[in-house]
C-alpha cells in the first residue's frame, strides 16, 4: 500500500477533509515570532515567521476553520485530504516544501512551509518585470515538471495560475497553495464541482462534465498565455457566467495577436494547450514542456 492510500484510502468514504484527531497542537504566539502578513486568501492568512522550534524563518499558513469547513462540505461523502496532508506528501524541487501541519490552540488548521525569498509569477507578469526576459520558457518548463510530478503521484492541483507560483532569487520556480488540490481518483473527477479560479477553469469543468488531469493542463496553458502576453486568451468579463460563455463559444485570441513578438510556432503550441476538447490538448505536462522546448526562438 502506497503512502497515498495509507493516508486517504481509496475512492469514496465517510470522513471529510477536516484535520484528523491526534494532530500536533500548538500555540502560535509561543512557537512563532511573526514578522508580518505576506498574503491572505479566501480561506487563509499567510505570515513570514521565525519558527523557534525549527530555528529558521518559515512561511506560516493559518486556515479559517469556518470557511474551510464550508468549503469541504462540497466534498461530502469523500475522503478529501486536508491541505496539510496533501503538502506533506509532496517532495519536488519545484514545489514549496512543507515541514509540518496541525491545529492551533484556537482550533484552526496550520501549515509550516519553507520561506521562499522571491516574487510571485503574477507580480512578474503584471509589472512586465525584466526578470522574465529570456526566462519564460525556462519558468514554464519548471512549472510543467511540478505539475507532471503531481499527476504521477495521483494529485490534481485544480488552481494553477500565476498567483500560485513563486520564483526565488536563483530563478527556481515553486508551485504553492494546495487548498483546492484533490486526489486523482474517479470519485473526485465526477462532474458538478466548479470550485476554482474562473480565469483558468477548463470547459469540461464549466459544463460540469467528468474531468481528469487535463483540467490542470488547460490551466497551465492559460498561465502560459499570461506569461507570454500579459493577457488571457479570452477577454475577462465582470460576470463569471459571461466569462464562461465566452470560453465555451468564442475562439481564443492567439498569443501572436496579443503579443506580436510571439512566433507562429509558439502561438500554435499555446493554442493547442487550451483546446476546448481535452483530447485535443497536450496529453501530459511533459509533452507541453517538450513542445515549448522545440519552438525556434527560446529567449522570450
Segments the model singles out, each with a brief description of its role:
Residues 67-89:
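AlphaC helix of the eukaryotic protein kinase fold
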Residues 145-155:
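Protein kinase catalytic-loop region centered on the HRD/HxD motif
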Residues 139-140:
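Activation segment signature within eukaryotic-like protein kinase domains
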Residues 35-41, 46:
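Protein kinase glycine-rich loop
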Residues 106-120:
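Conserved short submotifs of the Hanks-type protein kinase catalytic core
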Residues 100-102:
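A short, aromatic-enriched beta-strand patch in the conserved N-lobe beta-sheet
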Residues 121-131:
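AlphaC helix of the protein kinase catalytic domain
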Amino acid at each position: 500500500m502506497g503512502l497515498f492510500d495509507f493516508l486517504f484510502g481509496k475512492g469514496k468514504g465517510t470522513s471529510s477533509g477536516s484535520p484528523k484527531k491526534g494532530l500536533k497542537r500548538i500555540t502560535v504566539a509561543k512557537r512563532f515570532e511573526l514578522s508580518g502578513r505576506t498574503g491572505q486568501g479566501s480561506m487563509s492568512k499567510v505570515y513570514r515567521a521565525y519558527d523557534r522550534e525549527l530555528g529558521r524563518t518559515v512561511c506560516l499558513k493559518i486556515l479559517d476553520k469556518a470557511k474551510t469547513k464550508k468549503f469541504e462540505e462540497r466534498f461530502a461523502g469523500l475522503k478529501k485530504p486536508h491541505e496539510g496532508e496533501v503538502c506533506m506528501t509532496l517532495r519536488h524541487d519545484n514545489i514549496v516544501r512543507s515541514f509540518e501541519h496541525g491545529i492551533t490552540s484556537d482550533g484552526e488548521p496550520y501549515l509550516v512551509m519553507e520561506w521562499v525569498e522571491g516574487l510571485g509569477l503574477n507580480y512578474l507578469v503584471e509589472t512586465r518585470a525584466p526578470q522574465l526576459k529570456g526566462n519564460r520558457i525556462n519558468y514554464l518548463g519548471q512549472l510543467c515538471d511540478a505539475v507532471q510530478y503531481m499527476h504521477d503521484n495521483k494529485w490534481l492541483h485544480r488552481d494553477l495560475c500565476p498567483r500560485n507560483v513563486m520564483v526565488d532569487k536563483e530563478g527556481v520556480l515553486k508551485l504553492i497553495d494546495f487548498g483546492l488540490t484533490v486526489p486523482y481518483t474517479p470519485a473526485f473527477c465526477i462532474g458538478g464541482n466548479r470550485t476554482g479560479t474562473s480565469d483558468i477553469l477548463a470547459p469540461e469543468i464549466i459544463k460540469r462534465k467528468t474531468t481528469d488531469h487535463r483540467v490542470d493542463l488547460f490551466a497551465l496553458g492559460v498561465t502560459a498565455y499570461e506569461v507570454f502576453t500579459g493577457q488571457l486568451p479570452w477577454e475577462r468579463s465582470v460576470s463569471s457566467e459571461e466569462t464562461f460563455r465566452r470560453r465555451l463559444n468564442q475562439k481564443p485570441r492567439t498569443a501572436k495577436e496579443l503579443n506580436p513578438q510571439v512566433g507562429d510556432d509558439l502561438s500554435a503550441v499555446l493554442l493547442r494547450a487550451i483546446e476546448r476538447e481535452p483530447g485535443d490538448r497536450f496529453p501530459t505536462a511533459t509533452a507541453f514542456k517538450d513542445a515549448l522546448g522545440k519552438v525556434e526562438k527560446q529567449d522570450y
